[in-house]
Amino acid sequence: MKRPALLAFALATPVFAQPSALMKYACGPANRMFATLSAVSVYSDGHAGFDLNTLPGFTGQSCTSDKPFFFSVPVAEGSYRVTVVLGGDVPATTTIWSEARRLSVEKVHTEAGKSKSETFDVNVRVPEIAGDPAHHVRLKPREIGSLDWDGKLTLEFNGDHPSFRSISVESINPHEPTIY
């Protein structure tokens, strides 16, 4: 193939945006692969952390509680693949709800000291319409202040001693279709 033809082929080939970097959070000892979660890991604009005034306990290898707790990650509008490694030092049954009560993982049992990995997709929306700052989605009064439309990916951990060891969040290629 001659160089002009190769150049024409390269220019005609569509280039798609690559997914953003993987965001990883862990409840274990500090390491360079994950952001370590602790009692000071509270959600704020721009920083992932435990949200809605809930904070689990930390057992050295996992985040666990006898009550529901929330974890939020600030993200842009789009679809995300979430992988959660469940488990802890005590037996647990964990259910995960994403955003406003979307069931993502239902009653996964883990034995003490064991782990199970669960992967699911979450779609995050914001009221502003991309590319048109003058327009936005009109929210109903019941939607204002809910876990939808807020610019963050929120996970609720619930069940009998819900616990997790790590959470990974990765954006999905925007050219993949979202099916409801």
Model-derived regions: residue spans:
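Hydrophobic h-region of N-terminal signal peptides that target proteins for export
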Residues: 9-17
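Bacterial N-terminal signal peptides that target proteins for export
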Residues: 1-6
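Compositionally biased, intrinsically disordered or flexible polar/acidic segments
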Residues: 18-180
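Intrinsically disordered, low-complexity segments enriched in polar/charged small residues
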Residues: 7-8, 52
